[in-house]
Amino acid sequence: MSIEYVQLQLASPSEIKRWSQRILPTGEVVGEISKADTINYRTFKPERGGLFCERIFGSTSNGECSCGKTKRRKLIVPVNFNRLTLQKRNAELEATQAIIEVCPSCGVEPTNSKVRRYRMGCISLKKPVAHMWYFRNSPNVLAALLNMRSQEIDETIHFQTYTPSKYGTQNYCLHGGVQWYVNHWEPMHPYFAGDIDVSMDKAASWNSKSTFMPSQIKTIENCGGEALQELLTRLDLVFLQRMLSRKLKNTIEKKKLAAKSLRKRHKRRKTAKLLGRTDQKNYGITIKVREYSRRLEFIRSLARKGLRPEWMILSIFPVLPPDLRPMIQMSSGRFATSDLNDLYRRLIYRKIRFEKFLTLFDEEFLPDLLIRHDLCLLQEAADSIIDNGRLDKPAQRPNRKPFKSLTSIIEGKHGRFRQNLLGKRVDYSGRSVIVVGPKLRLHQCGLPREMALELFQPFVIRALLEESGVKNIRAAKNLLQRRSQMVWDILDTVVLGHPVLLNRAPTLHRLGIQAFEPILLSGRAIQLHPLVCPAFNADFDGDQMAVHVPLGLEAQAEARLLMLATHNWLSPATGEPSILPSQDMILGFYYLTTLKPTVSLKRPVEQPMAVRGRNLIQSNSIFNNFESVLHAYETSKVDLHEIIWLRWSSYIQTTNSEPLQITVNKTGHVTTVYDSFVMQSGATNGPDNSMLSVQMKSRDTSSISKVYNCLTSLNAAAFYILTTPGRVLFNNLIYENLFL
């Protein structure tokens, strides 16, 4: 079954009854919760008529009643499907359905315990209560429908003002701090339930200050949520929709005319005073347009979905199924219960208390203060179930933490929709804090061994069954729990070459989840190369990342070929590189490749590198390979920034191709000094092997050219480049990371 969408909307009282009430095979109607009890403290079984009643919500045992005397029976009729026609087969299949009875002892219908997840109950209220979503939210739906202020709606619901039962009248005088005596109500009613221009100057025994100011307000029966229900019932949605559409159209036309007249006055250069008055009129028209459009929007929504506004006032309060608000016994013997059970109990207790007051007194002598107080408590109990966090004084646990209401269970990041329906926790995944791993390669990540053992547990179990002689899965799991060395060795083999996916929320683009090769490490933090952090928008100040294991071969191939971090250098949005060296890396490169500074108090005179190189030709800072340079640096024979000569057998690129000095010794070996390297060659084939030394002067290359042309017949030459141990070390690092 595919679910396209989930919609929350109003439910009628008959719909709530259909959810909760059902008829037993005996003809008895069950569904209404009459007691606030949950379970029996001796038998630990649900109380009858309580919040976990088995008669209302179904039995807790599969196919058994509460006492165990009655079980669910099935009538099995043998059917020969080959000879019967389709109609006879359907008729006999209907006869094979389960026969369900009701236990004569406990009255519980033996059913499957799964029905306790969807069977609902209800609480019938003597006086209706308002739904909190429709008078405490912004915009206020009840205020918009009744064309009243939000404060008036709130005061009416919580019995701070009076709404008369006579249609078309409104009270203009009652407010907090005034009490109306019962014997004075009849003579006062024409004044406070009639028109506003009725004279109040008549002398009467009740028209005095001492009568109006003694104590609190006096209300009549039709007040609170019942008063709003009466007003909402009288709303004609079709007429209101037609009337508001006409008013909205006329108001918009007035606004256009006002704007047109304003432009004319600007042309005539009227005074600023007249323009200010016009702006005030336009502002008032804008407010009216906003009010009309908002009210019209609510009315159209109700009419389009076939809903009635009086359904916002609840006279039958629905109760969730018991398995969605469970009560669980812990190992210590105590019970842990959902917060909703405590909130439902408060509502039932206050409902029972109010009904008891109605039975103790006659209607003529009801103590109004107590009745009004109980109705306020009943409204607050209903509000705390719907949205406890929005109350001024929310219902709290003994540890002074507020209860979680229905709204808090549904809304927010950890609510039912975002946490469990839209985004679910998946298998083969984990989460931990990320730390920097500078020794890792770009396509690698450090994975804790404990996390890897849990993530790759099925692969490890399969390897144990195939290679280690373990006979069954239970024995393999016992080996995993003991954490033997064989398990860690198999884990290393399983993880080798198996990519994992790292994801950091929020995943705003496709680079928010990339593939890496795991490297098993001790500890509990995930190590990540610092260069891949910009793609995740991550840093190492406590960020967490999720690990996912691709299971199938197709998923592993996709992770390795498409999602590997080294295959995602460029941003798909801008085309710019997402992997760039950080500032500390650039400073490290500079430190490795720079020359040794001259230590002097005076301003140093910078010598050309070639001059310093010529002075070093006769020194001992000459090396034949990289290993000898690194060994000399590790043994502190040379400094990191010291200038050395290194034998070089590869391609040389230089900006100046003319030699600076050519030296030929008596044996015929030629030493040619260039700007940044030295070339040594074998003996010449000429008759004279005398020493020849020519040094280039400024802008004079004739003598050099003569000698240089004589060197064309040299044997194989050896090149020595001018460098530093730091540059050799930097070259080795690049070579290891690029070509290995």
Curated annotation (Swiss-Prot):
Required co-factors: Mg(2+); Zn(2+)
Subcellular localization, as worded in the UniProt entry: Plastid, Chloroplast
GO cellular component, one term: DNA-directed RNA polymerase complex
Gene3D superfamilies, A to Z: 1.10.40.90, 2.40.40.20, RNA polymerase II, clamp domain, RNA polymerase Rpb1, domain 3
Transmembrane annotation, as ranges: none
A Gene Ontology biological process term: DNA-templated transcription
Enzyme class: transferase
UniProt-annotated binding residues for Mg(2+): 539, 541, 543
Coarse class of the protein's main subcellular location: plastid
Coiled coil: none
Catalytic function, reaction form: RNA(n) + a ribonucleoside 5'-triphosphate = RNA(n+1) + diphosphate
Enzyme Commission no: 2.7.7.6
Pfam families in alphabetical order: RNA_pol_Rpb1_1, RNA_pol_Rpb1_2, RNA_pol_Rpb1_3
SMART domains in UniProt: RPOLA_N
Top-rank taxon: Eukaryota
Family to which the UniProt record says this protein belongs: Belongs to the RNA polymerase beta' chain family. RpoC1 subfamily.
Protein name (database record): DNA-directed RNA polymerase subunit beta'
Organism of this sequence: Ostreococcus tauri
